[in-house]
Curated annotation (Swiss-Prot):
The modification Phosphoserine is found at residue 53. Disulfide bonds: none annotated. The keyword Nucleus applies. This is Coiled-coil domain-containing protein 117. Residues 141-168 form a coiled coil. Signal peptide: none annotated. Keywords: Coiled coil, Cytoplasm, Cytoskeleton, Methylation, Nucleus, Phosphoprotein.
Length: 279
């Protein structure tokens, strides 16, 4: 209560009319500058914050908090958005082919690929770029292909060498010699085998070998065997018995038919000629 009796330093205590007078206009004789409307220049209602005052910093803080909340809400909406809507928005945001071509053209000009490209049209630019890329990438591709072919050839050669090294002698064809042949070779009969033929047996090859058998194995004159004599005697006895039986049968058939004697006579001559040929 004591403070109410104290004078306030911010207000004048004099009871003059200066305290109750409205503020003086900026231009004497006019309320507002020329060409300005009073409604536009009228002060807005509400507290006005000075930039250097604490109220201004608080207002800026509220604006930043509001922006953060807005961005956070937009991110949540993007997360809840269905996939189809996202794809549509991405397709809308994607640049068209002309934009891509322009970007490529700018990159080409920036890197200085070919200064004469700038005067060409867009299809001509693309053709020139493709030709330059083919020229730069053609040589490495040839080198890569040549290197691969060389690797394949080296691998095939290595495999062949391994097969030759792993090949065992037991798998090769062998020649079995008899005891007489071995003894003949020990006596160094050049007529039977030569040294070259013996060496060729260790290798898988096809060669013509001429061999002369020993005299004790094959004689010049063949010996007559008794089996052949017995066989010839038995065959002659069989033919004689068949010849005696066959005429008796012909006689039995010829008795009731005397008119057919000429036919049977021809048959007898035929059988006799056959017997002579067999003998």
């Amino acid at each position: 209560m004591a403070a109410l009796g104290r004078p306030f330093s911010g207000l004048p205590l004099s009871g003059g009319s200066d305290f109750l007078q409205p503020p003086q206009p900026a231009f004497p004789g006019r309320a507002f500058p020329p060409g300005a409307d009073g409604a536009e220049l009228a002060p807005r209602p509400g507290p006005r914050a000075v930039p250097s005052s604490p109220a201004g910093s608080a207002a800026r803080g509220r604006v930043s908090v509001h922006c953060k909340k807005k961005h956070k809400r937009e991110e949540e909406e993007d997360d809840d958005c269905p996939v189809r809507k996202k794809r549509i928005t991405e397709a809308e945001l994607c640049a068209g082919p002309n934009d891509w071509i322009l970007c490529a053209h700018q990159d080409v000009e920036g890197h200085g690929v070919n200064p004469s490209v700038s005067g060409l049209s867009i299809p001509g630019i693309l053709d020139v770029i493709c030709e330059e890329m083919d020229q730069t990438t053609g040589e490495p591709q040839c080198e890569v292909a040549r290197r691969k072919l060389q690797e394949i050839e080296d691998r095939i050669i290595d495999e062949d060498e391994e097969v030759e090294a792993d090949r065992n002698v037991n798998h090769l064809p062998s020649l079995v010699l008899s005891d007489t042949m071995k003894t003949g070779l020990k006596r160094e009969f050049d007529e039977v085998f030569t040294k070259k033929m013996i060496e060729s047996m260790s290798r898988p090859s096809m060669e013509l070998v001429l061999w002369k058998p020993l005299p004790e194995l094959l004689s010049d004159k063949p010996k007559p065997s008794s089996n052949t004599k017995n066989y010839t005697g038995e065959s002659q006895a069989k033919h004689v018995a068949a010849g005696t039986a066959f005429p008796q049968r012909t006689e039995l058939f010829s008795e009731p038919r005397p008119t057919g004697m000429s036919l049977y006579n021809s048959l007898e001559t035929a059988t006799s000629t056959e017997e002579e040929m067999e003998l």
